[in-house]
Amino acid sequence: MQPYLDLMRHVLDNGNDKSDRTGTGTRSVFGWQMRFDLSQGFPVMTTKKLHLKSIIHELLWFIQGDTNIKYLQENGVKIWDEWADENGDLGPVYGKQWRRWETPDGRVIDQITQLVNSLKNNPDSRRHIVSAWNPGDVDNMALPPCHCLFQFYVANGKLSCQLYQRSADIFLGVPFNIASYALFTMMLAQVCGYQPGEFVHTFGDAHLYSNHFEQAKLQLSRDTRPLPTMWINPEVKDLFAFRFEDFRLEGYDPHPHIPAPVAV
């Protein structure tokens, strides 16, 4: 996970101090890219422990098109609690845009089903793209999408993913995003008949909140450890049939968790 640590160090040493929506203050850079070869292990932090259960359940929740936190809460995942209304609703966030993008003429587009079909039937297409950034819905979302657009690429029997993230909370959010999209790529590779290739992570505003500086320095002081491997149930061939029990992280030996406050 050296590319992630390099980004964190670069922002601490060279970033611009800015105000932000939450009033916390950030240090940020604009424009950065990291690459992870998924054949070299599952890209999850080893310099601090991550709550993988939350990552898997959130991804399954996205894929099902859900926008209410009930499923997450039932499974002990609290990462969206601060943004939900009294009924648990978040508005037309990721799941809505991925699975039910509404067009001006009244049609509904299931971008994920379209993606699976195009990866299977037209692998060389340059249109394997899913967008969560819908200008017509942004104002009604509890939180506009941070990881807002991704594209897939097939070459030599391998499936790669590039994510564009407009806004990136480096300490708390980015480790989740890396693991989530790496896992999503592996799931799609399995159901579409490919091997996992690369996960390419491209950032707009990549920032450390000012109340995460000391935690970031602690993480940078720790040695990296070998990456674990992710077992995925090979019997599952339908993207929408995956369940939490179909995943198992093997050989994960991280340093202890580092607590940090969430900027809301």
UniProtKB/Swiss-Prot annotation:
GO terms for biological process: dTMP biosynthetic process; dTTP biosynthetic process; methylation. SUPFAM superfamilies: Thymidylate synthase/dCMP hydroxymethylase. PANTHER family: THYMIDYLATE SYNTHASE, THYMIDYLATE SYNTHASE 1. This is Thymidylate synthase. Coiled coil: none annotated. DUMP binds at R21, R126, R127, R166, S167, A168, D169, N177, H207, L208, Y209. Keywords: Cytoplasm, Methyltransferase, Nucleotide biosynthesis, Transferase. One of its GO terms (cellular component) is cytosol. Pfam families: Thymidylat_synt (PF00303). The keyword Protease does not apply. (6R)-5,10-methylene-5,6,7,8-tetrahydrofolate binds at H51, D169, A263. GO terms for molecular function: thymidylate synthase activity. It catalyses: dUMP + (6R)-5,10-methylene-5,6,7,8-tetrahydrofolate = 7,8-dihydrofolate + dTMP. NCBIfam families: PRK01827.1-3, PRK01827.1-5, thym_sym. HAMAP family: Thymidy_synth_bact. The lineage of its organism: Bacteria, Pseudomonadati, Pseudomonadota, Betaproteobacteria, Rhodocyclales. Its EC number is 2.1.1.45. It comes from Dechloromonas aromatica (strain RCB). PROSITE patterns: THYMIDYLATE_SYNTHASE (PS00091).
